[in-house]
Amino acid sequence: MANVIARRSTNASKLERWLGADQVEHISGSMRDWHGKRPILINGVPGAGGVWCGRGGDFVGKIDGGDFMSLADRCVERVDHAIGKVAKRHRMHGFSSLSDLINEVSNFGKRKDFIYQKQGSASVTGGTNTMWRVGTYPPAGNAAANAPGGAALNDATLGAFFFVNPSSPDTQHFVRGDVLSSTAPRTLLLYDRLFEVNKTMSSTTTEAVTGVPTRYQNTADDQPDSADGSFLFIETQAVLGATAHNWTVCTYTDHNGNAATLPLVTGNASNIVNRLDHPVGQWFCPLATGDNGIRTLTQMQCSASVTGTVAFVIGHPIAFMPAVVTNMLTIVDGINTAFNLTRIFDDACLAFLDVNASSTTAATFTGQFVTASG
């Protein structure tokens, strides 16, 4: 990861030509207030080591496409022609070489394919919708467990993708993702859903949370399982009443295990089901100055009594998956292009957010993503 961050800024004109100016601005705008020290991978952008978006909405990493062709052009070409030639140098993580990865996947069955179709609900332009409570595959997840315990989630949780953990000492990594959206541009975020807890909406008193996630709990900086980059969001699971409200004294422990308090988050009166209860353009709760991630949630509080159901959720990002053209499958070969191998930990509860929707139209997402272990 340090090697990725140290790379020069991504060539802006190439990136805009590849993804489209609207898509680039959408992702950049979604990351302007990002707290994590680690950037998030942009799936589908070719380049050894990948292209990433970090704090301030800045892109880093070398892009090998966008000179004469866009991602949409490439998808059409992939339908009609053979795949392009393999990139020569890549970051290997759990693999000694590209040949090692191909051998592991081809001869030892260490590739996993995850198929999905998520039928989204109506949105608000600039609002973020959860895909957790919608089907068809994986099926919709259940409502969150009540405070104080909540629930630490894993791959056996209803709504998650099921997979068999790799045998030790192998580790599992994100290789590629393909996405088709019924409306575009749209951006899915693949994330590990770590923990959720139901908030008592009829109460304005503080409500303690004692449950803790089981992944990304290392308090040391620059470790693969550090909470750096873990984020909190407020998920509407049943329509909220027409009552103005804010999320006030909500407390947490940061990526280093220190106690902290969230800045105030403004909720939405009459917030629709599945939309995050955040202002337009915000898909994660801001953290206290200097904090790079949230390790645990310790307290929730709302300024008013509101009808409806809300869950506080902790997640950890895996990759952005842009859909650039309506009803066209964005086909991206992660080995031959942005070979990055973001780690996916054992028992991960993988899920999606539809980040900062570009319109009010409900989007249906269909596709697959692939992991490999080694």
Positions of PLM-derived features:
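Polar, enzyme-active/binding microenvironments
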Residues: A2-K14, W18, D22-G36, L41-G374
